[in-house]
């Protein structure tokens, strides 16, 4: 039933195997499965350091004692215990796991409700549940006891007003403006990482916490103890990867809109900032500057001299950032080769398309390392080597036209099983390519992330949000919870993205407030799709109205200059 193996505490009973092991400072990793073995995948965990757990097994209840004798009052049978620094875990003969701080406080306990348990209830509710198995996959549920007065922060970015997530139900899935980063910090004094990239949900209810993955092979989570929130966050980031320092240009002002549709238009905006003496550090080339999606290159009809454009911007002290989508149009020059080599996301049934936006598109499979290399080689040739060396990784969730997660498959597995990890690997393609070129601080603007994305230079923005005061308010808590979840580089579209008119006085007031807020975000970026629309540019799509700091009246301009 209990076994110590290579510093790990192993429990097995009735076809289930539970493994608890030290993983980093003051942290314990728990894996459990009803398969014959564990997958061996570490997901968000980048590295395991030299910390080893101290394992003790007590087969005789009367043998309890020592410094922690009073900590296990509910443990009246045999049990196993593992210690790593400030964190202890006990698993009893009924398979219930309880986590303790070294001072004796209970931090977290699995939720079982059976006659044999401490509460002695005939509900037969299990703390770990495996059901509806197809092959070696299950619908997985992990339950924990709710704690009165507990506050929960983190989990990524959700478009809601709640900062404290206690009482919330959160979907574990990536969507435009929703970013699932499944780490939370508890006011009780621990951190928790759900180390599973599958689609599902979590409920932080008052009568219990419940994690669900719709399709997975094993339960996998990490508990981290600490005396302060900063200590817990430090340990978490050490295990999942710390972010590179933001380059100096990134801390300045970013000018962006949907969209500068040709080279001369973009340069004229940059020149005007220079003439006005207003500092501008970054200007962004948005989507549909390309020939076709998936060809990853400028359309020479509208961008005839990219090296010359980049040189002029550099002379003005301005960096250029280029939008890249993970989409490949079925009529693009790279589609057939990528399809033949297995570099594209596959559908399980129906029409083999994943997005419809200005064409018929399929996402490239960022979980496939060869696909990542292939895409970077195109990016390097057509952008990086032309002088455009910084990137905006849009549609990074990826944004399926139909969010039918069970219908899509990556090389790494079905989207239901592994889908939330896509933005991390999408980002990794650019991080690996840029570091190979000697970039010591590779940062990419991206619309999604997962646990561990920070290591690869994720600068997340909050997606295509609405231009309203209510939506603006939601971004404040979204940014704070993203930081707690381990994504420190974060920003928004100043003014919001959808629904504003450049000539609307009400929007001018919103813009001013948002601009002031944007100044104090990690990155200050003005972006949006302003009305009325202008119907010129590439054949696939038009362009929004002006979106520069002088576009919203004299008062807004003077205030913007101040900030």
Label each PLM-derived region with a short phrase.
Residues 140, 154, 159-161, 172, ...:
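Basic, gly/Ser/Thr/Pro-rich low-complexity segments located predominantly at protein N termini
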Residues 46, 118, 129, 279-560:
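Aromatic- and carboxylate-enriched substrate-binding clefts and catalytic-loop regions
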Residues 1-250, 256-258, 263-271, 282-285, ...:
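N-terminal accessory segment at the very beginning of proteins
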Residues 563:
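Conserved catalytic/cofactor-binding microenvironments
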